[in-house]
Amino acid sequence: MKRDVRILLLGEAQVGKTSLILSLVGEEFPEEVPARAEEITIPADVTPEKVPTHIVDYSETEQTVEELQGEIDKADVVCVVYDVSEEATVEKIRTKWIPLVNGDTKRGPRVPIILVGNKSDLRPGGSMEAVLPIMSQFPEIETCVECSAKNLKNISELFYYAQKAVLHPTAPLYDPEAKQLRPACAQALTRIFRLSDQDMDQALSDQELNAFQTSCFGHPLAPQALEDVKMVVSKNVVGGVRDDQLTLDGFLFLNTLFIQRGRHETTWTILRRFGYGDSLELTADYLCPPLRVPPGCSAELNHRGYQFVQRMFEKHDQDRDGALSPAELQSLFSVFPAAPWGPHLPSTVRTKAGRLPLHGYLCQWTLVTYLDVRRSLEHLGYLGYPTLCEQDSQAHAITVTREKRLDQEKGQTQRNVLLCKVVGARGVGKSSFLRAFLGHSLGHQDAGEPSVYAIDTVQVNGQEKYLILCEVAADSLLTASADASCDVACLMFDGSDLRSFALCASVYKQHYMDGQTPCLFVCSKADLPGGVPLPGLSPAEFCRRHRLPTPTLFSCAGPVEPCMGIFTRLATMATFPHLVHGQLQATSFWLRVALGAMGAAVAAILSFSLYRVLVKSR
């Protein structure tokens, strides 16, 4: 919605333009009227719509044609004033003023026009019969107001309607010739209806209608008012009410009726509550609310975000089988301009028999939020998070983690989403490693484009963590501008071709050797015979020299089954980033924790025994 309104008054000389402005400001008819009033600004707190309003007068004797055109170009709405007692001024509306306003304007959309019949005190019968044909001819005319500057009749109403024509314009909503909603308006209202239909039965129950009414207007409908609404719809629209519930056709009819009766601000209130702007597109402020993620921090869905997206899952899981079919996914994404995850099931998560289970669905939301929080905010906006959850914005569903440097200083991370970069030469088995993480066999092929990401949950010390694997070609990290940052690095080499180890070693030395990122070397294709040793340090010797864990064997084929424990180990290393020098052998690490606790207990017992000896010696 516009932040201020600029109203321009035009018309023939002596029709009372200046008198109208001065009567509004002074609340009395001026005895002396200048040729032209100065521009007046009405503060926001004294206007019905709480928007600053600028009122601009025009005088043909004081202003040039160029100055007039400049004022028209700046105006948000034009009030064409005529004298109800002078028919010639009415005819000038059609032949002079409307062509001048919208015939030569270069801005594109037509400027809304309010017809103002002044001096109604001189003609009690009014002039509506004369102006109705003009209103039918020019759709940009919003309304006609008859008033009297002398009697102060309808003065404030005149400027209210002018303000309303800017803030709640009819033209984007309604086609007066076809007497129906414009396509963009119908599309926006259809999306709003689908978001409000919580049980997916293609109709709004009394409970859903009252939730909608409360969200948009701050209070529910009285029971009798609710029945009256449904009665009006059922009398005018076949199928508008079904089983005592309002259908989409009935909902669209109601909004058409509001507009036809001059209450288009009602429809605009609904549209703006659900994020729409003057162009009937979701606004940038709505889709991308302010959310700062400082360097070294990351974004995650919080419990409110997970509750909402799970609620959307359950809403569209119509067969209650715990998974979304392609048709159910299409239903979920029907309120988006396009399917955000592509035409196929995401290849980044676990799927089941061509369906997306809740676990994989939550993983996909987690991945999108971590990689591109702006995109995640957009998706939450399309699903109606701010309105349905009664929050200012969908940023309420996001948590920004503390800086990684603080995690490293404290020796433990509070993050629930961990990034592991799987680095290696081409052909060492990185893609197979990602597929194994998702429980796929070596020969598994995804329906869509393969992804360099995979995400699943792992248990770390009894807590569930989301682990993201990101496949990275080792040679791409050897450039000066490469970004190797992550929570844990998995450096993969082919055990049957040890030349691939040299690349991993180079990446380690360039990016990780002097840092605090935990690293694990992984020897892939462990089912194949070992490669010919090369001059220099062997992988095991290299790891020992750099105080790294011994390379872990991994295979997706042959007699060696994929060891899923490797993924838990990577997540554990990321959770405890201070243990970067091979200290995180699963058994020895927890053994030291236990021994430390035991040592503390023994020390306490010895101290207590010594205390008893000292007491007895006294």
UniProtKB/Swiss-Prot annotation:
Record PTM: Ubiquitinated by PRKN in a PINK1-dependent manner, leading to its degradation.
GO biological process, one term: mitochondrion transport along microtubule
Positions annotated to bind GTP 2: 427, 429-431, 525, 527, 556
Binding site for Mg(2+) 1: 18, 57
PROSITE patterns: EF_HAND_1, EF_HAND_2, MIRO
Catalytic activity: GTP + H2O = GDP + phosphate + H(+); ATP + H2O = ADP + phosphate + H(+); UTP + H2O = UDP + phosphate + H(+)
Residues reported to bind GTP 1: 16-19, 59, 118-119, 121, 149-150
Domain EF-hand per the UniProt entry, residue ranges: 184-219, 304-339
Taxonomy, superkingdom: Eukaryota
UniProt protein name: Mitochondrial Rho GTPase 2
